[in-house]
Curated annotation (Swiss-Prot):
Protein name (record): Putative pyruvate, phosphate dikinase regulatory protein
Family annotation (InterPro entries): Kinase-pyrophosphorylase, PPDK_reg
NCBIfam families registered for this protein in UniProt: PRK05339.1
Pfam family, one: Kinase-PPPase
Function (record text): Bifunctional serine/threonine kinase and phosphorylase involved in the regulation of the pyruvate, phosphate dikinase (PPDK) by catalyzing its phosphorylation/dephosphorylation.
Family the UniProt entry places it in: Belongs to the pyruvate, phosphate/water dikinase regulatory protein family. PDRP subfamily.
EC number: 2.7.11.32, 2.7.4.27
Keywords: Kinase, Nucleotide-binding, Serine/threonine-protein kinase, Transferase
Lineage, broadest ranks: Bacteria, Bacillati, Bacillota, Bacilli, Lactobacillales
Binding site for ADP: G151, V152, S153, R154, T155, S156, K157, T158
Recorded catalytic activity of this chain's protein: N(tele)-phospho-L-histidyl/L-threonyl-[pyruvate, phosphate dikinase] + ADP = N(tele)-phospho-L-histidyl/O-phospho-L-threonyl-[pyruvate, phosphate dikinase] + AMP + H(+); N(tele)-phospho-L-histidyl/O-phospho-L-threonyl-[pyruvate, phosphate dikinase] + phosphate + H(+) = N(tele)-phospho-L-histidyl/L-threonyl-[pyruvate, phosphate dikinase] + diphosphate
Domain of life of the native organism: Bacteria
């Protein structure tokens, strides 16, 4: 039977930082169930914070804090030490190191990571762009794209487009289907901005089969036929070569890893 650990996440903002760290840590413990349903964002009152910490003691929970307010963080730390509560402060030890190195204090303003600045609105615009020019719906958008993703069905074009859009990049994508002519505008796109996505045929067949299963479609079709998939991938590689696209094999890469490679590629263009 797997062990279970209850985790409280406390923040004076959204608390996204602790969630990202927790996801990375929990992945290293497949035999432990982490109950992370106890999330407490926008905490700004001392008594409210203490009530949460008292409940954490009752649940024998681990408390992860991203409180930036120095007074609240001190209250939480002192309470936890006095009551033997497992408490992890993700912010203030980092602040102390920076102050030691630079002599500079943090501004201690919650939510500055999520402020509505030009970067935020650029990201929203990029997401709208990715949706508008998804799946080759409007090929003229290729000319305004930071990146154009090319690939056969189920090579992660759409999720990769949205992921990169969340980083502010304008991304469009085009599904490659041997029977469907390529849009002429593709010839006008800077080849350095073309990324061709491929996947090992056997893995792609499994991904497609899983997709059909999720839709309640179990009948064998050419969509999952291995020979047909080989033909599609051969066709896609011909297209990549013709237009000078950089090729990335998605077989053993996550969306995040692939996005990193694309970002590194983009940096070389600027």
């Amino acid at each position: 039977m797997k062990k279970e650990m209850i985790v409280y996440s406390v923040s004076d903002s959204l608390g996204g930082t602790s969630q990202k760290l927790l996801s990375a840590v929990t992945a290293q413990y497949p035999d432990i169930i982490f109950n992370n349903s106890y999330r407490f964002p926008f905490i700004n009152k001392e008594e409210e914070l203490l009530d949460i910490l008292r409940d954490a003691i009752k649940d024998d929970a681990l408390v992860i804090s991203t409180l930036v307010d120095g007074k609240l963080a001190s209250v939480a730390r002192e309470f936890s030490q006095a009551h033997g509560l497992s408490y992890l402060d993700l912010m203030h030890p980092f602040f102390e190191i920076i102050k030691e190195k630079t002599g500079t204090d943090p501004i201690e303003v919650p939510g500055t990571l999520h402020r509505l600045d030009s970067e935020y609105f650029n990201k929203i615009s990029a997401i709208e762009f990715a949706v508008k020019y998804d799946d080759g719906k409007a090929p003229q958008g290729f000319l305004d794209s930071d990146i154009v993703l090319l690939g056969v069905s189920r090579t992660s074009k759409t999720p990769l487009s949205i992921y990169l859009a969340n980083k502010g990049y304008k991304v469009s994508n085009l599904p490659l289907i041997p029977e469907v002519p390529l849009p002429q505008v593709l010839e006008k796109v800077d080849s350095r901005r073309l990324i061709g996505l491929v996947c090992e045929p056997e893995k792609l067949a499994k991904i497609r089969s899983h997709r059909l299963d999720s839709l309640g479609l179990t009948q064998e079709t050419s969509y999952t036929d291995l020979e047909k998939i080989y033909q599609e991938l051969d066709y896609s590689k011909t297209v990549f070569k013709k237009y000078g696209a950089q090729i990335i094999n998605m077989s053993d890469k996550s969306i995040e890893e692939t996005a990193f490679l694309i970002e590194e590629h983009l940096k070389k263009l600027n």
